């Protein structure tokens, strides 16, 4: 993973809080109403393919582990609303032979207000040197 990619922002992507997807999340979490707090993960998975295939980042996804996940809500998500996903690499740091990437994904209203911020830590393990 290339530490020089730290700070890189990715193209904005439109994202609808889709009733069908929300219903599936509610079913899994046995939630009767509202948008589950972890629904933001669906937004992250919309942009993750572009990030892990970015040659400028140079990540080897076969060695990636999910390290942590945080959500910060300014208000609840609403079914049917159209938001924009803004993603950026907040930081990349090495610890020993491993690399830690912090990805920040924001869901933003048309007026520019941030509704929710997700922060994910991905860990790229060192290459296996046994073989």
Where are these regions (language model features)?
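HotDog/MaoC-like acyl-thioester-processing domains
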Residues: 1, 76-131
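Hot-dog-fold acyl-thioester-processing enzymes
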Residues: 1-68
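Residue-level signal for functionally critical sites in structured catalytic/ligand-binding pockets
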Residues: 18-24, 66-72, 94-97, 120-124
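Mid-chain, well-packed structural core segment of small domains
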Residues: 60-86
């Amino acid at each position: 993973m290339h530490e020089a990619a730290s700070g890189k922002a990715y193209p904005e992507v439109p994202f609808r809080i889709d009733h069908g997807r929300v219903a599936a999340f509610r079913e899994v979490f046995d939630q009767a109403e509202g948008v589950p707090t972890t629904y933001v993960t669906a937004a992250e998975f919309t942009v993750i393919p572009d990030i892990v295939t970015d040659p400028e980042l140079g990540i080897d996804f076969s060695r990636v582990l999910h390290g942590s996940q945080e959500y910060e809500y300014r208000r609840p998500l609403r079914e049917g609303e159209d938001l924009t996903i803004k993603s950026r690499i907040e930081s990349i740091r090495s610890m020993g032979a491993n690399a830690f990437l912090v990805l920040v994904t924001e869901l933003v209203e048309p007026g520019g207000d941030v509704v929710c911020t997700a922060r994910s830590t991905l860990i790229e393990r060192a290459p296996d040197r046994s073989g």
